[in-house]
C-alpha cells in the first residue's frame, strides 16, 4: 500500500 500525492489536498491510495 502506498500513497501518492499529486498536489495539495490531493492523494491517491494504491492498495
Swiss-Prot record:
Lineage, top ranks: Eukaryota, Metazoa, Chordata, Craniata, Vertebrata
Example of a GO biological process term: adaptive immune response
Intracellular or extracellular location(s): Cell membrane
Role, per record: J region of the variable domain of T cell receptor (TR) beta chain that participates in the antigen recognition. Alpha-beta T cell receptors are antigen specific receptors which are essential to the immune response and are present on the cell surface of T lymphocytes. Recognize peptide-major histocompatibility (MH) (pMH) complexes that are displayed by antigen presenting cells (APC), a prerequisite for efficient T cell adaptive immunity against pathogens.
Keywords attached to this entry: Adaptive immunity, Cell membrane, Immunity, Membrane, Receptor, T cell receptor
UniProt protein name: T cell receptor beta joining 2-5
Superkingdom of the organism of origin: Eukaryota
Keyword Membrane listed: yes
SUBUNIT field: Alpha-beta TR is a heterodimer composed of an alpha and beta chain; disulfide-linked. The alpha-beta TR is associated with the transmembrane signaling CD3 coreceptor proteins to form the TR-CD3 (TcR or TCR). The assembly of alpha-beta TR heterodimers with CD3 occurs in the endoplasmic reticulum where a single alpha-beta TR heterodimer associates with one CD3D-CD3E heterodimer, one CD3G-CD3E heterodimer and one CD247 homodimer forming a stable octameric structure. CD3D-CD3E and CD3G-CD3E heterodimers preferentially associate with TR alpha and TR beta chains, respectively.
GO cellular component, one term: T cell receptor complex
The UniProt record lists the keyword rRNA-binding: no
Amino acid at each position: 500500500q502506498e500513497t501518492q500525492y499529486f498536489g495539495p489536498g490531493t492523494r491517491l491510495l494504491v492498495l
